Amino acid sequence: MAPVEHVVADAGAFLRDAPLQDIGKNIYTIREVVREIRDKATRRRLAVLPYQLRFKEPLPEYVRLVTEFSKKTGDYPSLSATDIQVLALTYQLEAEFVGVSHLKKEPEKAKVSSSIQHPETALHISGFHLPSKSKPLQEAVDRGHAADGPENLEFSSFMFWRTPLPNIDRELQELLIDGREEEEEEEECEDSDDDGGGWITPSNIKQIQQELEQCDTPEDVQVGCVTTDFAMQNVLLQMGLHVLAVNGMLVREARSYILRCHGCFKTTSDMNRVFCGHCGNKTLKKVSVTINDDGTLHMHFSRNPKVLNPRGLRYSLPTPKGGKYAINPHLTEDQRFPQLRLSQKARQKTDVFAPDYIAGVSPFAENDISSRSAILQVRDGMLGAGRRRLNPNASRKKFVKKR
């Protein structure tokens, strides 16, 4: 297995202690990945790495491109800001050393196409026998015994599609033959078990662990990403980038996602929607889908009962608040929200070369910390104003009501 020329490592590669020096020649990452690692054992390994770890920040245009692509695949809510930067760095290295002609600009969307295949008759109805095709009466007469008149025609044709009576002697011979074959198979299995084939024993456990820890890399790969995050792997595969596996954790195929309303059962491929476009309720759930050979859509539902658990959905709404910086719960799709702009003092920029510049008390830029927007940590529209999107993987504080 030849090592890859350029490898981008995620936090999962360091946490799993992946042998990156054997996987790639040049190892890249971003500083936010190292800051995410908190446990002592991993930080000690990072202090004495047997290879050079290169820190490189992705360009803004690649971050924007990966963000838009992840929104179309439906993995954007599952990705943090650090994950998007790692994906953007992989895309940037692929563009620098290989090119972007083979990469996809749009993911494969799942579309519902009607199938023209319909059963001719209803099947498996208890108490009724429905033949697949109606046979002509003349054919039934030719195959059966010769009938003297038209009166016996119905009974002669009936004998051909009814269930024949079982032959006891033939079934007994088949059971005896099957029993002998099963005994021979059991003896062969016992002989193979004695050899230890297929079992994990103390003698071959280290060899099996080495095979599982190997990174399965395709041939002629210049740039790859080592990550254990399935959402990141799905985005990489749909873009056409290479995913390097650690401990066998690799997405076998790229999945497409849709949003399905569990209130009216309507589906949509627009993954940015929060409310259902048909009934207007906040009842959309992400469902993975695959397209069959005949064009029909196959949805994969989760068996976990917590997916549709109604606990915590009924609660008292707070009193609506007014004002420029009011934050009210988002209840409807057409609900209007304030723009949440920065204060005028914070929006001012200090440009000493401007013709209208007047030197004040200090030539340095002023940092607004006393206004209402600064206290609420409001950012401008160009910097992600409104409802800021935080890290979905960060731990949330649980507020316990004191008695």
Curated annotation (Swiss-Prot):
Zinc finger annotations (NOB1) as residue ranges: 251-323
Coiled coil (UniProt feature): none
InterPro entries, A to Z: NOB1, Nob1_euk, NOB1_Zf-like_sf, NOB1_Zn-bd, PIN_dom, Ribonuclease_PIN, WRNPLPNID
Name the UniProt record assigns to this protein: RNA-binding protein NOB1
Compositionally biased spans, kind Acidic residues: 180-196
Main subcellular location: nucleus
Gene3D superfamilies from the UniProt entry: 5'-nuclease, Nin one binding (NOB1), Zn-ribbon-like
